[in-house]
A protein has these predicted regions:
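Active-site microenvironments in enzyme catalytic cores
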Residues: 12-225
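Gly/serine-rich nucleotide phosphate-binding loop at the start of the catalytic core
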Residues: 1-16
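A short, sequence-level motif marking secondary-structure junctions
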Residues: 4-8, 174-177, 239-244
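Active-site neighborhoods and metal-handling regions in enzymes and metal-associated proteins
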Residues: 207-209, 218-245
Length: 245
């Protein structure tokens, strides 16, 4: 479908047979009460992800690295490192002359990191998030490797890209991350990111057309709510307008 030149026109003129209502499908997907549930809206495509794309995440990656995966050390490092380099990373265009100047300054202060290199350097961090056909869909439980004690969901916008590199649409995803594993060594990124059911995508792809474009997506806000069985509630959000690369 994504290989078509005008996907939205094809879909506008497509006629299908109604199998189930959206409301019923959402309910069965969430409750797992039948065999009918939503799958991830991708099949044979490679599932890639980019890391260190926000200034805030750059600081967090440096904290993980300095803490060597120990969450107990993270808070004091967050106050120290965030105060030193947090503001200097705002509004920097990766690979620019200003980015090079900041890099030199941070190196002289002993604060340069491989994560800052992919955050404001000329080359982005691109990694394999999940194996083909391994992503789970809306309503499915995500997987957490039991070797991890410090981990988190990462709500993301997922781009639907065809084989020519053309972005045809977007959806939502959960880039589950094991912070204590990656924090020990960047070479453990694959172990921290690619686990059973660690990639959730869906529910649907919003195909770009005249009413919703890539430019519209760049100003989108993503919200996340985590509710624990013990009554713990966490609300968070991120804005695509703050993305740095």
């Amino acid at each position: 479908l994504l290989e078509l030149e005008n996907v939205h026109e094809y879909l506008d003129h497509s006629v299908g047979e109604k199998v189930i209502s959206i409301e019923e499908l959402f309910e069965t997907s969430l409750k797992r009460t039948s065999n009918m549930s939503l799958l991830a809206p991708c099949d044979f495509q490679a599932v890639k992800a980019c890391g260190v794309t926000f200034a805030k995440s750059m600081v967090e990656r440096v904290i993980e690295e300095r803490a060597a995966g120990d969450p107990k050390k993270a808070e004091s490092l967050r106050n120290h490192i965030g105060g030193l380099i947090g503001d200097s990373l705002q509004d920097i265009v990766p690979g620019s002359e200003k980015a090079s100047e900041v890099k030199k300054a941070l190196i002289s202060e002993g604060l340069w990191s491989q994560y800052l290199e992919v955050g404001i350097g000329k080359d982005a961090e691109v990694f394999t998030k999940a194996q083909t056909l391994s992503s789970v869909g809306f309503g499915s439980e995500v997987g957490l490797n039991p070797i991890s004690n410090w981990n988190n969901p990462e709500p993301e916008i997922v781009l639907a890209v065809n084989s020519k590199g053309i972005i045809q649409g977007a959806t939502l995803g959960n880039d589950v991350n094991l912070r204590d594993i990656e924090g020990r060594s960047a070479l453990l990124l694959g172990k921290a990111k690619d686990n059973n059911a660690s990639c959730s995508i869906g529910p649907f792809i919003r195909i770009f057309d005249d009413s919703y474009t890539l430019e519209d997506m760049k100003s989108a806000n993503i919200s996340l709510k985590v509710e624990g069985k013990e009554g713990y509630i966490l609300n968070g959000s991120s804005s695509m307008s703050e993305i740095s690369r």
